[in-house]
């Protein structure tokens, strides 16, 4: 009876939580002691100075010492160890930790497995330290080389670290502790009478190691706005959180949480944490700062005048944004990125944490999901309805109800008795299936996974050393300890066909609830004093738990296919490095217009901070979207990197054919737009895989000196060639669209030309949202509609050539087999297209050893903005003429009913993998 009452109380809790986000369930800064302590500090409070500077193993190494000698028998300030390392491409790494030679009570946790191994190969071994006395200082500062244009300065007294330009007025780029807010709570030994416990609501945190927080200020120079530090449902340009005129005086929180129906325009933390901030200013220069730390973090963006008596004397032409970073535990392990261009900063960050995994082609198509498709018959009917309504899709998803009692790696034998046959029927059409696998394991002695994990000692422990027992979807649950490489390898092995009975090569994985979510835990997550392998407290690794779970699952799918095929794993929790293992989505959003709008700054922020493969649930997870909202969401979502429809089980069914013929047509057109542009998207995913530059980008990344773009988060770039403006208000049939730059833009719907550098008011009919191709670009497409992306493999390409004022354009196309890792061994096609002086040329960008070939042809070449009236085109080396026609613009099977006539070269007969030219006569 007692257990039944507990179950009923948890059911009540879950249902109440699902109704709305309850702010009181989660801590504010004032309810978080380390944050409250740090925020009370005043500028100049730091009492540390730098001493004993030397070069050791190519690094600048020094001690941080108390400025005044320790007095009395109170807490003694012990020296800290500082090390500064320099890397190629303008990266500085600063680490500060306890002095291990003084035998601190324990070793602070340093996050492993995030910095890629190749990064250390870029280290510049410092040979010497120069000295310089800064005006007003009583002791010299240490100066080291960073690159030909930059140097790092370690100021001794007062303690400060910054990177500056070498030339001119030696402009600062990024600095740490310029305002003297640095504080490092040193580990101590508990003595009689000490009470280190903390309480929140009904939960008590034993805090066995006591206070150990770190805080410091970071300043960005020549800065108009700062961006990044996801995950929050806020504007793209981060608003100040402290100082004059601030309405919401709450820091941006980084603490992975299971948040239902989250608020928009809130600094409270969501499902992921990436402590990477990017600054951009009027000069067009960009810089960045990254703190590698997995403990809870709180970050203030300080408003101008946050402390009128502090600050650095700067010329009036300079602007600066100050920020304040606070963490509960860990060490200082920070990275300064000098830029100076926007893409330089994201590349520098990617060189530390890695670039995005190259997805399989199917993963870039449309995904259909619901909690839950109830049985095999339901799956078959949904699949057939897509075909009946001529709507392509690539993946059908199954949520938790497909399992045997929420036991992962199992199937409900009544509802899904033939899982392999079900998957094979989808695979026959080129489609895949995804099933959910969460980190909470049902505590059932008859469940093979729980039995094995218990016997092997693979669960996270509670503070007493017993297997942690929390509550989640299956009821009483334990959680796999993903911090251990041994356990991660074991977990990966669960995805083998032998262990995951009923799985096939077309089955992929969804990791949800991996913050981790614990329904009866503090803030719906795991207690901070739970223990991981090696005695690491959960507070130290919390934000990385989902990252390790994602990693282990992805590695498991690679092992399953013996390293041949790329994995696909969707994760809700995120952390630096997540991009190496798969896609993410923005969690449990709501069927509201504001949630549609906020999806854009959320996805832009994720892309800027390395997570290039992201999306939001189309239509909102909670609630029932009105047809107009759902249509507009599909129209925007067709340009998300990750494109998935999903809904809660209490919502009405919302497959695209359930809202009347007209709305079905509109949603089908939006999905067709995505499939038409798949060659362009896939090329952009390859760019992200190589460089780290995101697929979906803020306007200022392409137009860094255009101030009108700096806070624009309702429009976005897809690559460098497309600009998309969403419609975010009910009943809207017009939109104001700012088109940056000096060149023209071409409407994707009809080819109409708009000048750059101004705002245009234009129609936004129900058929589509405003979208434009930038003059000077060439975009590859496929215009034949198929059931799935794999059925498009042999279809011909269309090249859309958007000419600029010089009658020139260029673009790229990347092709591989769409599924394997053979591209790493040179099996791919990479072409560059250039139109100049009336000639379109295709040249090879792949290395000479690249060996993939293709029989696919270029079927159409569409020229937008061609100034003359040509009569024919000459194709070389075939030495043949191609047909030319003037007419309306075609987008897939759609033909513009009005607009500018465009020139189309039909059937030039050239192969996509060969060199050729097409000359306009």
UniProtKB/Swiss-Prot annotation:
The active site is at residues 512, 515, 588. Its main location: endoplasmic reticulum. One of its GO terms (molecular function) is glucan 1,3-alpha-glucosidase activity. Residues 1-20 form the signal peptide. The keyword Ribosomal protein does not apply. Changing residue 517 to F: In psl5-1; Compromised defense response induced by the bacterial elicitor elongation factor Tu (EF-Tu). InterPro entries: Gal_mutarotase_sf_dom (IPR011013), Glyco_hydro_31_C (IPR048395), Glyco_hydro_31_N_dom (IPR025887), Glyco_hydro_31_TIM (IPR000322), Glyco_hydro_b (IPR013780), Glycoside_hydrolase_SF (IPR017853). Its EC number is 3.2.1.84. It comes from the Eukaryota. Glycans are attached at residues 689, 804. Pathway: Glycan metabolism; N-glycan metabolism. Disruption phenotype: No visible phenotype under normal growth conditions (permissive temperature of 21 degrees Celsius), but mutant plants have a temperature-sensitive phenotype (when transferred to 30 degrees Celsius) showing radially swollen roots and reduction in cellulose production. Keywords: Endoplasmic reticulum, Glycoprotein, Glycosidase, Hydrolase, Plant defense, Signal. GO terms for cellular component: endoplasmic reticulum; plastid. Cleaves sequentially the 2 innermost alpha-1,3-linked glucose residues from the Glc(2)Man(9)GlcNAc(2) oligosaccharide precursor of immature glycoproteins. Essential for stable accumulation of the receptor EFR that determines the specific perception of bacterial elongation factor Tu (EF-Tu), a potent elicitor of the defense response to pathogen-associated molecular patterns (PAMPs). Required for sustained activation of EFR-mediated signaling, but not receptor FLS2-mediated signaling elicited by the bacterial flagellin flg22. Heterodimer of a catalytic alpha subunit (PSL5) and a beta subunit (PSL4). Belongs to the glycosyl hydrolase 31 family. This is Probable glucan 1,3-alpha-glucosidase. It comes from Arabidopsis thaliana (Mouse-ear cress).
């Amino acid at each position: 009876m007692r257990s039944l009452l507990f179950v009923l109380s948890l059911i009540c809790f879950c249902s109440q939580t699902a109704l709305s986000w309850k702010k009181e369930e989660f801590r504010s800064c004032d309810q978080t002691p380390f944050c409250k302590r740090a925020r009370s500090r005043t500028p100049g409070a730091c009492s540390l100075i730098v001493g004993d500077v030397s070069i050791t193993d190519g690094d600048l190494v020094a001690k941080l010492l108390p400025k005044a000698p320790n007095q009395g028998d109170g807490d003694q300030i012990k020296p800290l160890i500082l090390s500064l390392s320099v890397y190629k491409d303008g990266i500085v790494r600063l680490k500060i930790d306890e002095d291990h030679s003084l035998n601190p009570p324990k070793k602070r946790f340093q996050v492993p497995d995030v910095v890629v191994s190749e990064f250390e190969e870029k280290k510049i071994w410092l040979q010497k330290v120069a000295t310089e006395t800064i005006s007003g200082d009583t002791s010299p500062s240490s100066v080291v080389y960073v690159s030909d244009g930059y140097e790092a300065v370690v100021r001794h007294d007062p303690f400060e670290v910054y990177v500056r330009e070498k030339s001119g007025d030696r402009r600062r780029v990024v600095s740490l502790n310029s305002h003297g807010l640095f504080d490092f709570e040193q580990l101590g030994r508990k003595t009689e009478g000490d009470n280190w416990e903390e309480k929140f609501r009904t939960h008590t945190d034993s805090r066995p190691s006591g206070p150990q927080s770190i805080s410091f200020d970071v300043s960005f120079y020549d800065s108009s706005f700062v961006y990044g530090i996801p995950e929050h449902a806020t504007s793209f340009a981060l608003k100040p959180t402290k100082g004059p005129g601030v309405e919401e005086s709450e820091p941006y929180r980084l603490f992975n949480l299971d948040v239902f129906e989250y608020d928009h325009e809130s600094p409270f933390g969501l499902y992921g944490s990436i402590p990477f901030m990017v600054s951009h200013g009027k000069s067009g220069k960009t810089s960045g700062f990254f703190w590698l730390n997995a403990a809870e973090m709180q970050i203030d963006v300080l408003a101008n005048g946050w402390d009128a008596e502090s600050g650095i004397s700067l010329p009036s032409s300079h602007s600066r944004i100050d920020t304040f970073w606070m963490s509960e535990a860990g060490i200082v392990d920070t990275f300064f990125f000098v830029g100076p261009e926007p893409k330089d900063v994201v590349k520098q960050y990617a060189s530390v944490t890695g670039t995005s995994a190259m997805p399989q082609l199917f993963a870039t198509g449309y995904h259909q999901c619901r909690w839950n498709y109830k049985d095999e018959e339901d799956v078959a009917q949904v699949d057939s309805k897509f075909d009946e309504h001529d709507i392509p899709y690539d993946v059908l998803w199954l949520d938790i109800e497909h399992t045997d009692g929420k036991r992962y790696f199992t199937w409900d034998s009544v509802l899904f008795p033939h899982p392999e046959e079900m998957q094979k029927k989808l695979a026959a059409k080129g489609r895949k299936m995804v099933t959910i696998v969460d980190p909470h394991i049902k505590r059932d002695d008859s469940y093979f996974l729980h039995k094995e994990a218990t016997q092997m000692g693979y669960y996270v422990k509670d503070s007493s050393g017993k297997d942690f027992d929390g509550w989640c979807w299956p009821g009483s649950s334990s959680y796999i300890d993903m911090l251990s490489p041994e356990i991660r390898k074991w977990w990966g092995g669960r995805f083998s066909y032998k262990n995951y009975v009923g799985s096939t090569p077309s089955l992929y994985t969804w990791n949800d609830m991996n913050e981790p979510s614990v329904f009866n835990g503090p803030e719906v997550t795991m207690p901070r004093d739970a223990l991981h392998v090696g005695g690491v407290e959960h507070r130290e690794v919390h934000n990385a738990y989902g990252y390790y779970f994602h990693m282990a699952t992805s590695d498991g799918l690679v092992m399953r296919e013996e390293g041949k095929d790329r994995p696909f794993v969707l994760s809700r929790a995120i952390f630096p490095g997540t991009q190496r293992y798969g896609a993410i989505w923005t969690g449990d959003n709501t069927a509201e217009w504001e949630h549609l709008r906020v999806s854009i700054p959320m996805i832009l922020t994720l892309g800027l901070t390395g997570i290039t493969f992201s999306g939001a649930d189309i239509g909102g997870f909670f609630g029932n979207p009105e047809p107009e909202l759902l249509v507009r969401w599909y129209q925007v979502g067709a340009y998300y990197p990750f494109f998935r429809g999903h809904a809660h089980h209490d919502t009405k069914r919302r497959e695209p054919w359930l809202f009347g013929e007209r709305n079905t047509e509109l949603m089908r057109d939006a999905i067709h737009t995505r499939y038409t542009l798949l060659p362009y998207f896939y090329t952009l995913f390859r760019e992200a895989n190589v460089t780290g530059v995101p697929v979906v980008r803020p306007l200022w990344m392409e137009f860094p000196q255009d101030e009108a773009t700096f806070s624009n988060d309702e429009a976005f770039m897809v690559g460098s060639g497309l600009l998309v403006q969403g419609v975010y208000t009910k009943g809207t049939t017009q939109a104001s669209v700012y088109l940056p730059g000096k060149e023209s833009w071409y409407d994707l719907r009809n080819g109409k030309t708009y000048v750059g550098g101004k705002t245009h008011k234009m129609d936004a009919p129900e058929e589509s949202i405003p979208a434009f191709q930038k003059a000077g670009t060439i975009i590859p497409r496929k215009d034949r509609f198929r059931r799935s992306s794999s059925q498009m493999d042999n279809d011909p390409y269309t090249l859309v050539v958007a000419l600029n004022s010089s009658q020139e354009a260029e673009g790229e196309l990347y092709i591989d087999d769409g599924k394997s890792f053979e591209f790493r061994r040179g099996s791919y096609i990479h072409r560059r297209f250039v139109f100049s002086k009336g000639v379109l040329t295709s040249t090879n960008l792949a290395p000479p050893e690249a060996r993939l070939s293709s029989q696919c042809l270029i079927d159409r070449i569409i020229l937008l903005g061609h100034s003359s009236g040509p009569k024919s085109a000459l194709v070389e080396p075939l030495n043949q003429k191609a047909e030319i026609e003037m007419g309306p613009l075609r987008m897939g099977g759609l033909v513009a009913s009005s607009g500018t006539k465009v020139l189309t070269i039909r059937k030039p007969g050239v192969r996509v993998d060969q060199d050729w030219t097409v000359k306009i006569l």
